[in-house]
């Protein structure tokens, strides 16, 4: 089942590729202690006291336009972040008795959780093949209680009179306050095992929000861990450039591209890696790795990709691509090589071809309808957040995105993830078909990260790899590569994603 929010996903991909440039270099080792929630008597008078009543009937979704059949139990409405802004939420309880409570955090930044609810892991789905809402048999509510948020403020249906939330600090504060508001509505969930799962830029939200929750004395919750799907984890060179040749080689082995030209491409990449000193970095991608920071070269990469694309495709041969894209921009080079065999290549899933229409988006049209907004209790969405194309426009708030990425964002691997792993589980999932966030770059970044007293993983992926991928799981941190998915894993292979969650994160 391929359930995508099409235009909105395309928008997410474009902006998340750009944000990678904003991440700084990191080559340091960390050993810190997590700041725990204060549960002493001195702060007990601040503790959130759950109200003993059932879920609010006013937030119950009683119907959805065009949905046929029995609607599952759903709630939506607003959670107060502070006096002048509220975040829109959708909550779906598990259909089985479950002690698991997952908060899903969409990427972008500036893309609404409502999109994920309808297109990735919620109980109701809308897709290109199914433009009317229908039951999603692979919903995460099959095993967990689920919450989706339109955050940060300025995203989706969220409403208020405040300025956009544009910093990690403010977004973290808003999230903590919104979660307090949520627990007041649904007090029985406070004792459930809480996990934050973020996709793409949502990896930054999930890790930072986890630390904010653990530093909040008024929340007495059962926090358990963080899941990161297609996560943005490193600076641009590490995430996209240095390991591009390994990514291309892996795609070729999977049989998607370059079946007859892989040896030629491999030789060309070998030359370029040496010229750019990437080979010295790749030599450190060992298991275990030596226990000192991995040095990497730095370059200024040209942004004139459209010009380079035209030049590279003129003549349509591999040699012309390598000649046209000189220097060390191996990410763009890889992208254009794929275009030679698939002129409709979509970077969030390189297995898609010209038969897929990324511009046919029934979900955004549906969410902008007045009757749908009324059914979802989203009638308070501020007109200030509404473009000429509706609240969701292309699915994401690009004005908000630009404001967020103008701030310097530190990789979550520098400090936060190592601290979290001291007491909690962190699990990464990456897709081999994702050209937006290269799994090879994430693995390189992890091998340059020290957590729980050791740098990187010790066990080699090669010793564990199957036709489906591999999983490394050491010292409270796991990394899974799936060969079946691209950037939006929950919609592409929901069964695999569930297995990843249950085997590496949920316990």
Curated annotation (Swiss-Prot):
GO CC, sorted alphabetically, is: cytosol; extracellular region; nucleus
The domain of life is Eukaryota
Supply the alphabetized keyword list: Carboxypeptidase, Glycoprotein, Hydrolase, Protease, Secreted, Signal, Zymogen
Species the sequence originates in: Schizosaccharomyces pombe (strain 972 / ATCC 24843)
Q: Which InterPro entries match?
A: AB_hydrolase_fold, Peptidase_S10, Ser_caboxypep_his_AS, Ser_caboxypep_ser_AS
- Its Enzyme Commission number(s) read 3.4.16.-
Q: Which residues form the active site?
A: 200, 434, 487
Cellular compartments annotated: Secreted
User: Per its UniProt record, what SUPFAM superfamilies does this chain match?
Assistant: alpha/beta-Hydrolases (SSF53474)
Is Nucleotide-binding among this UniProt entry's keywords? no
Family per similarity comment: Belongs to the peptidase S10 family.
Q: What induces or represses expression of this protein, per its UniProt record?
A: Mating pheromone signaling is required for induction.
Report the protein name in the record: Carboxypeptidase sxa2
Q: Does the keyword Secreted apply?
A: yes
State a single Gene Ontology molecular function: serine-type carboxypeptidase activity
Q: Which gene produces this protein? A: sxa2
UniProt enzyme class: hydrolase
Write out the ranges of the annotated region (Disordered): 41-64
Question: Where is the secretion signal located?
Answer: 1-22
The protein's matches in Gene3D superfamilies, at most eight in alphabetical order, are given as: alpha/beta hydrolase
- Residues carrying covalently attached carbohydrate according to the record: 38, 45, 259-260, 300, 448
Set out the biological process GO terms recorded for this chain's protein.
conjugation with cellular fusion; negative regulation of conjugation with cellular fusion; negative regulation of induction of conjugation with cellular fusion; negative regulation of MAPK cascade; proteolysis involved in protein catabolic process
Record function comment: Involved in degradation or processing of the mating pheromones. Its loss causes a persistent response to the pheromones. It may be required for stabilization of enzymes that are essential for zygote formation. May degrade the mating pheromone P-factor.
Q: Per the annotation, which location comes first and is thus the protein's main one?
A: secreted
